[in-house]
């Protein structure tokens, strides 16, 4: 269905021949048995941890050149007793999809290793992610990400997303921390833990995962409780990322309401308010499917209580203010995304998912086809330097020289490789 036999867009348009990527892909992709991690990789240090395990930076041994990020899945645990009860659905999906997907704008899996009942996913190493880059541009004082860099990042992101969607894969967790960037300026979509196939599903996507996409990047149809959704949810997230690259802060920074003890999914009232503040109140005249949404009555209640009935879209006002505050103009060092940038943003942040622009349509938008040409290296022409990813030795697994079988926990559920700068709780 995908990967090995499918042609795809390259990062500057056109299609890659199948052979060109196979020759670049690390050999041995997929499951490897009776191999020890330390026999093949030198562990440089610890990157990050989270719910499901830990991530380490490593260098290949014995002619296996390059740097790698090794993601270690921990076994389930009760107290001090390790219970080998299996892997999470998220881990299984990520391994299955990453073993098949093969595109220059999707993170590359080198191999999977099973050692002492621990599973390791070995990925190519990426030095940066968009969250780290955004954070860098806010320190020590705010300075805009150059418009040509944003254009390249966005094009490569959409290019990878087109490949996923063409191969019936929804990512469902696009956000700056999950968009990786190599030191040579190549953008990779990472963390496929929430990704899933959407080709003729036996049940609604909602029945399998009731909550998807980090709250600030969650599409309105998801907030409205839609049981059926499409690749459009990923395009809304791209719009949020585009806005964040421009403004250096999340455009819809709401507070998430947590599930109750009965695991009932609550209406995300605060997040919907943040969207309405800028996008105006969604209306059935422009979004016919709105009235059939499970949370429509909640939206009506919100509109009445907050005086949102007459709230109109002010995205253009937000956009112009963003350009002014961050110094985007035709004669500035940062350049400008121009009117084309606003038009693309407005089509990505379209309330009605049936009208929202697709990845393929977005790649053909005048924002990319006019003005400064898109570069395959997003850092091209940029004279600044971004800090390297933070790698430490402060980890029991490293100090003990034993990666598998430890009692430590963690693995980033929000980033394949971790990140240098941690954001406030998302």
UniProtKB/Swiss-Prot annotation:
Function: Component of the srb8-11 complex. The srb8-11 complex is a regulatory module of the Mediator complex which is itself involved in regulation of basal and activated RNA polymerase II-dependent transcription. The srb8-11 complex may be involved in the transcriptional repression of a subset of genes regulated by Mediator. It may inhibit the association of the Mediator complex with RNA polymerase II to form the holoenzyme complex. The srb8-11 complex phosphorylates the C-terminal domain (CTD) of the largest subunit of RNA polymerase II.
Domain Protein kinase intervals: 41-368
Keyword annotations of the record: Activator, ATP-binding, Kinase, Magnesium, Metal-binding, Nucleotide-binding, Nucleus, Repressor, Serine/threonine-protein kinase, Transcription, Transcription regulation, Transferase
Subunit structure, interactors included: Component of the srb8-11 complex, a regulatory module of the Mediator complex.
Gene Ontology CC, one term: mediator complex
Annotated ATP binding sites: 47-55, 71
SMART domains noted in UniProt: S_TKc (SM00220)
Pfam families referenced in this protein's UniProt entry, alphabetically: Pkinase (PF00069)
Catalytic activity: L-seryl-[protein] + ATP = O-phospho-L-seryl-[protein] + ADP + H(+); L-threonyl-[protein] + ATP = O-phospho-L-threonyl-[protein] + ADP + H(+); [DNA-directed RNA polymerase] + ATP = phospho-[DNA-directed RNA polymerase] + ADP + H(+)
Enzyme Commission number(s) from the entry: 2.7.11.22, 2.7.11.23
Named cofactor requirement(s): Mg(2+)
Enzyme class: transferase
Family: Belongs to the protein kinase superfamily. CMGC Ser/Thr protein kinase family. CDC2/CDKX subfamily.
Stored InterPro entries: CDK, Kinase-like_dom_sf, Prot_kinase_dom, Ser/Thr_kinase_AS
Protein name: Serine/threonine-protein kinase ssn3
Disordered: annotated segments: 390-426
Subcellular location, principal: nucleus
GO molecular function: ATP binding; cyclin-dependent protein serine/threonine kinase activity; metal ion binding; protein serine kinase activity; RNA polymerase II CTD heptapeptide repeat kinase activity
Active site positions: 173 (proton acceptor)
Record carries keyword ATP-binding: yes
Subcellular location(s) per record: Nucleus
């Amino acid at each position: 269905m995908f990967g090995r036999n499918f042609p795809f867009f390259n990062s500057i348009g056109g299609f890659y021949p199948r052979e060109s990527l196979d020759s670049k892909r690390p050999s041995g992709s997929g499951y490897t048995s009776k191999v020890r991690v330390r026999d093949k990789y030198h562990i440089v240090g610890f990157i990050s941890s989270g719910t499901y395990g830990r991530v380490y930076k490593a260098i290949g041994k014995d002619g296996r050149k390059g740097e790698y990020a090794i993601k270690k899945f921990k076994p389930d645990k009760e107290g001090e007793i390790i219970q080998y009860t299996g892997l999470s659905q998220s881990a299984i999906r990520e391994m299955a999809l990453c073993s098949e997907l093969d595109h220059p704008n999707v993170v590359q899996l080198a191999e999977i290793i099973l050692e002492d009942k621990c599973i390791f996913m070995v990925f190519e190493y990426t030095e940066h992610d968009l969250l780290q880059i955004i954070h860098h541009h806010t320190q020590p004082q705010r300075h805009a990400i150059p418009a040509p860099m944003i254009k390249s990042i966005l094009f490569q992101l959409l290019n990878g997303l087109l490949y996923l969607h063409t191969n019936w894969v929804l990512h469902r967790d696009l956000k700056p921390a999950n968009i990786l960037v190599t030191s040579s300026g190549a953008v990779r979509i990472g963390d496929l833990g929430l990704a899933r196939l959407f080709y003729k599903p036996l049940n609604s996507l909602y029945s399998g995962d009731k909550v998807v996409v980090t709250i600030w990047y969650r599409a309105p149809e998801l907030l409205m409780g839609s049981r059926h959704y499409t690749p459009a949810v990923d395009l809304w997230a791209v719009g949020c990322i585009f806005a964040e690259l421009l403004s250096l802060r999340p455009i819809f920074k709401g507070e998430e309401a947590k599930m109750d003890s009965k695991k009932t999914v609550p209406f995300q009232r605060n997040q919907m308010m943040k969207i309405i503040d800028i996008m105006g109140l969604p209306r059935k005249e422009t979004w016919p499917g709105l009235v059939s949404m499970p949370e429509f009555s909640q939206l009506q209640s919100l509109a009445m209580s907050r005086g949102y009935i007459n709230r109109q879209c002010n995205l253009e006002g937000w956009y112009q203010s963003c350009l002014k505050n961050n110094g985007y103009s035709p004669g500035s060092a940062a350049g400008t995304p121009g009117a084309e940038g606003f038009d693309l943003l407005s089509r990505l942040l379209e309330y009605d998912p049936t009208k929202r622009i697709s990845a393929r349509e977005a790649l053909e938008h005048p924002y990319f086809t006019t003005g400064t040409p898109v570069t395959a290296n997003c850092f091209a022409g940029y004279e600044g330097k971004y800090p390297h990813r933070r790698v430490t030795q402060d980890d029991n697994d490293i100090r003990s020289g034993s990666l598998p079988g430890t009692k430590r926990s963690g693995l980033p559920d929000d980033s394949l490789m971790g990140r240098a700068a941690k954001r406030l709780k998302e």
